[in-house]
C-alpha cells in the first residue's frame, strides 16, 4: 500500500512541476518579448530613415533576409 502511495505522490509532484515550469517559462518569455520585441520591416524602415537613408523595399528585404540568416 505504501509503495502505491509513494508512486502516486511522485507522479502528482512531477505533473505539478511540469505545469508550474510551463507557466513560469511562458511568463518569462512574454515579459522578455515585451521588453525586446523582434525587429520587423516597419522598425527597419524607421531606423533607415533616422540614419538619413531612403528605405527602398529591396534594401529592407535584404536586411531582413540577412538578419534571419544570422539568427539561424
From Swiss-Prot:
Coiled coil: none annotated. It comes from the Bacteria. Its main location: membrane. Pfam families: UPF0154 (PF03672). InterPro entries: UPF0154. HAMAP family: UPF0154. The keyword DNA-binding does not apply. The chain crosses the membrane at residues 4-24. One of its GO terms (cellular component) is plasma membrane. It is a single-pass membrane protein. Belongs to the UPF0154 family. Disulfide bonds: none annotated. The keyword Metal-binding does not apply. This is UPF0154 protein YneF. It comes from Bacillus subtilis (strain 168).
